């Protein structure tokens, strides 16, 4: 409609979500004061604050992915190993590409509807929540099969599969 086109043609106020703000500065100062206070100093030089859980999981996945490349490429400490990921059964970490690779709760839907999923389908190892034995077995399997574990993502809320269940 003409009215929508006219409204869209005008300058729009947009949030600049990529710029730091004073809330982030306050959080950074509070973290720096609290973290490491028993050791005499905070061991971290910087903190990264993000706008959502999805952004934080995407970034964590990207960092793990970058580290995995360094370790599994030729010449790396784990060169040639197959890459695996660990998550809890029923866990949800997001719908964007890297988080969905760790999301067991939506795995079936992705496998049925996404062509790209067939390249990642067998990379996720899932463990029942609270299962120390399952976790030990996952790492034993990784050693026995010469797998490289990229990362282990935990879903402390289980909001998609089992809302209200907290993982201690």
Residue ranges and their predicted role:
Residues 1-51:
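Glycine-rich phosphate-binding segment of PLP-dependent enzymes
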């Amino acid at each position: 409609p003409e009215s929508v086109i006219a409204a869209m043609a005008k300058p729009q106020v947009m949030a600049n979500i990529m710029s730091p703000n004073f809330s982030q500065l306050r959080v950074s100062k509070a973290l720096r004061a609290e973290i490491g206070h028993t050791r005499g100093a905070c061991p971290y030089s910087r903190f990264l604050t993000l706008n959502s859980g999805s952004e934080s999981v995407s970034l964590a996945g990207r960092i793990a992915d970058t580290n995995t490349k360094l370790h599994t490429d030729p010449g790396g400490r784990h060169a040639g190993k197959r890459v695996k990921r660990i998550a809890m059964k029923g866990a949800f970490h997001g719908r964007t590409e890297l988080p969905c690779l760790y999301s067991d709760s939506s795995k079936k839907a992705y496998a049925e509807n996404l062509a790209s999923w067939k390249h990642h389908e067998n990379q996720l190892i899932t463990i029942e929540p609270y299962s120390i034995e399952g976790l030990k077995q996952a790492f034993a399997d990784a050693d026995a099969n010469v797998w490289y574990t990229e990362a282990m993502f935990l879903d402390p809320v289980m909001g998609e599969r089992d809302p209200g269940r907290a993982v201690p």
